[in-house]
Amino acid sequence: MPDAVGAIDQGTTSTRFIVFDRRGTIRAQAQREHEQIFPRPGWVEHDPREIWRNTHAVMREGLARAGLVPGDLAAIGLTNQRETALLWDRRTGEPLHNALVWQDTRTDRTVAALARDGGRDRFRAVTGLPLASYFSASKLAWLLDHVEGARAKAEDGTALFGTIDSWLVWNLTGGPDGGLHVTDVTNASRTQLMSLATLDWDEAMLGVFRIPRAVLPEIVSSSAVLGETRDPFPGVPVGGILGDQQAALFGQTCFAPGEAKNTYGTGCFALMNTGPEPVASTAGLVTTVAYRLDGRPPAYALEGSIAITGALVQWLRDNLGLIGASSEIEGLARSVEDNGGVYVVPAFSGLYAPHWRDDARGLIIGLTRYANKGHIARACLEATAYQTREVLEAMERDSGCPLSELRCDGGMTVNDLLMQFQADILDRPTLRPKVSETTALGAAYAAGLATGFWKTLEDLRDNWAVDKRWHPHIAAEERRALFAGWGRAVERSFGWVEENA
C-alpha cells in the first residue's frame, strides 16, 4: 500500500522533489538550481528544457533517497512559480523561446498603453488583477508578436501556451505522445486572462491581448486526479496543481476565511483566505483563487506580492560579493546593532503591492561614512519585513479582519534575525511551522486528498504544529520611526524610469 506522496516544487531559482509521509513530514528531497538569464536590463528568462531536465533528475534522486519505488507513491503533486510564460511546439516538445519569468518587465510599455484607457484597474473586476507586466497575458502577447512563426502556430493549434505547471504536466504525462495540456485555477487566475466569476478563459480579455483560444490549456481543479506519469517513471497519479503561493496557503492549512500566511522566498507573498466569494481590493492587493477541490466551489484569496526579498540576498552575494553564501547574511547583519540609518528599497523591477509602481527602481539611501557592509546587510533583511507590513496593513483594510498572528514559511524563515524583526515591525507574533517547506507540502496535500491518501481537511490541520514563535519587543516609538524612514525611502524610488526610456 502506498505510504508517501511526492511533490514537485518548481521555483524561480531551483526545482525540488520532496517526499512526504502521512504526517506531512519530509522523508527525503533533492534539489537542482537552474540558470537565470538576463538578456537585457529588466529582461529575465529561464530555459524550459533545463527546468524539465532538472525536474526529471530530482524526481529520480528524491525517490531513491527516500528508499522508495514509484509504486510506493500514492500521488504526485506539483507547485510552481506563477505567471512565468512559455510557448512550445506540441509536435516536437521544443520551446519556441525561453520562458519569460514573472520578474520580467519587457512588456511595461504594452501595459502602460493599455492603462491609458481606463487606468490600471480597468480589468480588475473581471480578473481581480491590476494591469502589470508581472502577469502572464502581456508576456504571452510579446511571445506571439516577437517570436518568428509563433502566432501562426498558436492559431492552428501547433503551439501550446502554459505557465510552468502546464509545461511540466505535459512532459510528465507523455509530452508529444499524448501529454495533458492543462493548468489549474490558481495558475490560470494569475494570467490576467481568466474570469474569477466563471473560472474560464474570458473572451474579452483574449481579445484585448490578441490571444487565440486554441493555444490555451484546459483549466482544471487544484486537487483532482488528472492522469498518470509516464516520465521519468510510469503509473503514479498526478493529483494536484497549485501555484506556489496558493500551495503555501494550503500547506499552512489556512482553510477558513480570515486565515493568512506569508511566504519568504525569492519574492515575498502574503495570502488570506476570503472564502467562497471574491473580495475586491481597494488597497493595492490582488484578488485571486486560493484553491479548488474537485467537485467543490472554489475558495478565493487576497494576495500581496513583493518582487524582491530572497533575491536581494542573492544580489548581495552574486553582484556585490558582500557575502560568499546566502546563509552568511544573518551573521553579517548581526555584526551591527541596527541599520545605522540605512534603507535598501529593492525595486529592481518596480514595486508590487500595495504600490504597483513599474517606474520605481532600487536604491540604497541614508549612507554616511559611518555605514558599513553590516548596515547594508541588515537593511536588506529589514526591507523584507517593511514590505510585508505594508502588504498586511492593506490586507486588513480590504478584508476588515485584523490579523492576530502571522504564519510564516519559506527558505528565509531560518533567519532568526529577520523573523524577530518581522514581529517587531508588525507588533504581533510571527510563527514558523515545524515543516517550513509548506509550498511543497501544500502540493502534496492537494494530490493526497485527490487520491484518498488523506481523507479530509481536518486530517491536514492535525498535522500542523509550531516550531518557533517570535514576539515583538521594541518600543512603539522606535517602531514608528523605523517604518516612517522606510516610507521616505520608498517615495524616493518612484519615478526613476520614464515612460519613453
From Swiss-Prot:
It comes from the Bacteria. GO terms for cellular component: cytosol. It catalyses: glycerol + ATP = sn-glycerol 3-phosphate + ADP + H(+). ADP binds at T12, R16, T266, G310, G411, N415. One of its GO terms (biological process) is glycerol-3-phosphate metabolic process. Inhibited by fructose 1,6-bisphosphate (FBP). Belongs to the FGGY kinase family. This is Glycerol kinase. It comes from Methylorubrum populi (strain ATCC BAA-705 / NCIMB 13946 / BJ001) (Methylobacterium populi).
